[in-house]
């Protein structure tokens, strides 16, 4: 997966994640994960979310100066579940991740300074579904993959303003 000419990520056949990173303090190829199922760059390319069957981590390809600050090359373990993790997406602020574990869609913050905040967004009561988050519209879309009459569902995550 190519973010730009200075940041390129590759998942090998044996599920190792390699990152070519030409940054301020790093230059070259480095293995940053094992058992990796997928990855997403943040919109600015400074962060890379990657996940295995049961864990999500974030690697900082560039220095992050917003609190809490992180250094280039820093890796943070975000969550670990006994259930398989799927449907990982960045939330619109790129300081939270949306993912599914079991039949629940959850949101977790990246801030690891204290107790990790993880919340359930929705309990779908479905065995097998595909979900994705659209940050432009602030909608969560999902489809039941086991249903013959597949339907696309949408949930708005935008807070309504009280007037």
Show where each model-derived region lies.
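Long, low-complexity intrinsically disordered regions enriched in Ser/Thr/Pro/Gly
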Residues: 83-86, 103, 131-132, 138-143, ...
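Structural motif
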Residues: 12-21, 51-68, 100-110, 146-162
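Hydrophobic beta-strand positions that form the internal "hydrophobic ladder"
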Residues: 8, 48, 96-97, 139-141
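Loop/turn-rich, solvent-exposed surfaces of beta-rich toroidal or solenoidal domains
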Residues: 80-110
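Solenoidal tandem-repeat scaffolds enriched in leucines and small polar residues
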Residues: 1-32, 59
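C-terminal soluble interaction/assembly domains
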Residues: 105-126
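Repeated scaffold domains used in trafficking and secretory/extracellular systems
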Residues: 1-3, 33-46, 76, 81-90, ...
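A short beta-strand motif characteristic of beta-propeller blades
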Residues: 25-32, 67-69, 73-80, 115-122
